[in-house]
Amino acid sequence: MQLVVARIGRAHGIKGEVTVEVRTDEPELRLGPGAVLATEPAATGPLTVEAGRVHSGRLLLRFEGVRDRTGAEALRNTLLIAEVDPDELPEEEDEFYDHQLIDLDVVLADGTGIGRITEISHLPSQDLFIVERPDGSEVMIPFVEEIVTEIDLEEQRAVITPPPGLIDESEAVVASSRDEETGEAASGDEAEAPKGDA
C-alpha cells in the first residue's frame, strides 16, 4: 500500500537540496538516506534519498541525480510516496496512518452522525479531517485530542466533541452579537481567561 509521506517545496541553495513538508510521524524511517520513493506526478520518480538534514527547523533532502538548483526546482510540489505494509501499525498507540482514518464515520459523543472522513489534510500546525456531510457539504475538523476524543478502528468511527460553530455555523458565538445581547460589560469587570492550554 502507498502512503504520501512528504511534499517537496522550494529549492535550497545551489547543490540540489529541497525543502520538504513532512507528512509522516516517522521521517527518519520514511525519508532517510537510501529510501526509494514513488512520486506524484509519477514521471518525476522514483526518487532515492541521498542525504537529509534539518536547517532552521525544516527538513532538507537531496536526491540521487539532482545536483543543482535547476534540478531541485523541477521537483517543486512533487508528492513523495512510500510503500508500506498494510498490516504495519504506527509505533505509538495514539498515532494512525491516513489509510486507517479514511472512511471512518464521524459521530458526536451521543452517537449523532456527522459524516465520513474523506481526506486528511496535513498542515504545519495540525492535521485536519475533511468530513463529507450527508448533504454533500464538507466540514474541516482539527485532529486534536480536545475535539477528537476517540478513534475506534474496530467500530470504524471517530468520536468528536466540537466547540460551538465548528459543525453548525448557526451555533457560532460572534463577539459583537454576544455583546449586543448581554449588554456592555461593566467597566470594572475582568475578562475571564479562556480555558485550555496556555
Swiss-Prot record:
Keywords: Chaperone, Cytoplasm, Ribosome biogenesis, rRNA processing. Residues 160-198 are annotated as: Disordered. Residues 181-191 have a biased composition (Acidic residues). One of its GO terms (biological process) is ribosomal small subunit biogenesis. Residues 92-166 form the PRC barrel domain. It holds the Pfam family PRC_RimM. GO terms for molecular function: ribosome binding. InterPro entries: PRC_barrel-like_sf (IPR011033), PRC_RimM (IPR056792), RimM (IPR011961), RimM_N (IPR002676), RimM_N_sf (IPR036976), Transl_B-barrel_sf (IPR009000). Binds ribosomal protein uS19. The PRC barrel domain binds ribosomal protein uS19. HAMAP family: Ribosome_mat_RimM (MF_00014). This is Ribosome maturation factor RimM. The lineage of its organism: Bacteria, Bacillati, Actinomycetota, Actinomycetes, Kitasatosporales.
